[in-house]
Amino acid sequence: MALLTLDDLSLAFRGVHVLDNASRFVESGEKIGLLGRNGTGKTTLLRMIAGDQEPDAGTCVLASGKRASFLPQEVPGDLSGQVFGVVQEALSLQVSEGQIETWEAEAKSKQIIDLMGLDSDVDISSLSAGRKRRVLLARALVTEPDLLLLDEPTNHLDLEAIEWLEKFLASWRGTLLFVTHDRGFLRRVANRIWELDRGRLSAWECEYDEFLKRKAAALEAEEKQNALFDKRLAEEEVWIRQGIKARRTRNEGRVRALKQMRQERQQRREQPGKATLAI
């Protein structure tokens, strides 16, 4: 059974689909890099999976009894208190529901703080942005999530911290879905690629470098297919302007087909950087 199921997810802003009936599965142990141009909705998708954003339609379902944790891109401005308290707070719900004892929460918090190379007694406000990110990662991991969602995890980190994070995530046994602009980090951590492009969420069962090759081939094929479609549409537009032939009963099917082609062309979302052809 899949760890996470996305079923016909749709979300639009100002009439533009960020997600258009997206359906995908995440299996345990996968480390998925989520790619897409700026503004395509990658962070929105992570927030949707985390339960912080409602879709217009469709569902995100985490397998029964499984947990997900989300590390946002920016450090919250209201984050305060000692490192130990900030991390332990993530376990407060489990303690209140009797899932774990208070002493267990304390032990778990201390263990993950030590693993992150942090000082439990330091006030988080005195830390650098990179160290604050480590605290937030510790808070995300202390709940022992089955699925970890990371939005730009290398932001504000120095090279040493990035190398540490890469090694940690590469050896971590959980499942990972993350967004990053750091291609080196992506190459070393991801074993699968998801891409969000013009509302479509595609899955590529390969690492990043192989994805680049396959994606280039797919875009080339798309361009050729669109060029053939546009040529055929232009020919049909010339035909319809002839007038009398199009009004004959036996040509009604051809007229309907032309109307359908016009609609398909109108709805096409061009590759980023491509101009829309008006006919």
For each predicted feature, which ranges?
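ABC ATP-binding cassette signature C-motif
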Residues: 1-226
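Flexible nucleotide-interacting loop at or near the entrance of a catalytic core
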Residues: 4, 97-105, 219-279
